Amino acid sequence: MNMFATQGGVVELWVTKTDTYTSTKTGEIYASVQSIAPIPEGARGNAKGFEISEYNIEPTLLDAIVFEGQPVLCKFASVVRPTQDRFGRITNTQVLVDLLAVGGKPMAPTAQAPARPQAQAQAPRPAQQPQGQDKQDKSPDAKA
């Protein structure tokens, strides 16, 4: 069994449902999307029509999928990596890791980037707070 993420591809899906689950043991958030897709010719004997599929997805991507009374056409980047199901079994599974387009409109790279600068902007704040606490520590010493 390959225990490392491998190169995936691009998947275009009509998303019909999103769902999340939080593990009570670890607190980890699991997310999935359910979609409808045409069955490729010859894929399953003489099967024709559409199939319902479910994919694991990075939980942070769910906020960008907004339903407006109908399924949403989304394009995702995916990788194959080991995932653990609710029964503890580990299997290599296709996981959707990046949202490339919603409703046929490409996602702007800057729309996904703000989370990182905000985290960096928050890093100096704790450094500034101890300085303020030092001043508070000095003032009680000065009174005593």
UniProtKB/Swiss-Prot annotation:
Transmembrane segments: none annotated. Residues 134-144 have a biased composition (Basic and acidic residues). This is DNA-Binding protein G5P. Residues 106-144 are annotated as: Disordered. Signal peptide: none annotated. One of its GO terms (biological process) is DNA replication. Belongs to the inovirus G5P protein family. It comes from Pseudomonas phage Pf1 (Bacteriophage Pf1). Coiled coil: none annotated. GO terms for molecular function: DNA binding. Keywords: DNA replication, DNA-binding.
